[in-house]
Amino acid sequence: MRDKRQNSLAAASPFPKPASPLSLAAPTTTGLFALSLAIFDLDHTLITGDSDYEWGQFLIERHIVDGEDYERKNDRYYEQYREGTLDIFEFLAFALKPLADHDRRTLDAWHKEFMQERILPMIPEASRQLVDKHRQQGDTLLIITATNSFVTRPIAEFFGVHHLLATEPEIVDGEYTGKVSGTPCFQHGKVERLHQWLLEHNETLEGSWFYSDSHNDLPLLREVEHAVAVNPDEKLLAEATRKRWPIIKLY
């Protein structure tokens, strides 16, 4: 059952005023609240842009890929993602190819530059405060993202979040193959991957939170006890308003 804190944050009409992010998390007074799982989407939720798209733009800027063709495809796939029409396997064949074309040492060096130039400027202080609030409460922190783990693991580490569920690029003999390993962490795939993780870590969704900006995450938002829309897109805003989910702005 949704608690009174969430109901008090619900919309009145027709679009709710964003709630304060730090007012949402439950206190941890002994005997009143159990520790919970706090799940965060990454792109356009904890950061102000899309790390997958920005990695592509970084590759273009450095002339690592064919600029004109790659940018056209990168833009098209990004729009398909926003519209909810993305063929995830077609996209991954495109997005993971540069990983297969270069050795790990080179890729890791590029990623350090990518973090400094493109990712760190996209991390608002409010995002760090929200993650820290759940950390201080003793909650288990998890970032879940459709973007591949090569791009996102260093970002999760920057937030101090050790648990990451991301689309996994296949690795053979220490190098990327350009193929995907397992289920892509996208739409219903996020639910599948999360339930597998829950079994492996002896966790449950009791008292769980999930913060996301995207209608692509509606399957998972409907699974948790406390769904929170963060700077939501139009479709998620409509659903959050209808469901009376809290709506917050982090940037």
Question: Which ranges hold each PLM region?
Answer:
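Intrinsic disorder/low-complexity segments enriched in small, polar and charged residues
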Residues: 2-3
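Ala/Thr-enriched low-complexity intrinsically disordered regions
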Residues: 10-12, 19, 25-30
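Hydrophobic alpha-helical membrane context
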Residues: 16-19, 53-55
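Alpha-helical substrate-recognition element adjacent to the catalytic core
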Residues: 24, 29-37, 42-168, 177
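C-terminal cap/substrate-recognition subdomain and adjoining C-terminal extension
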Residues: 31-35, 109, 116-251
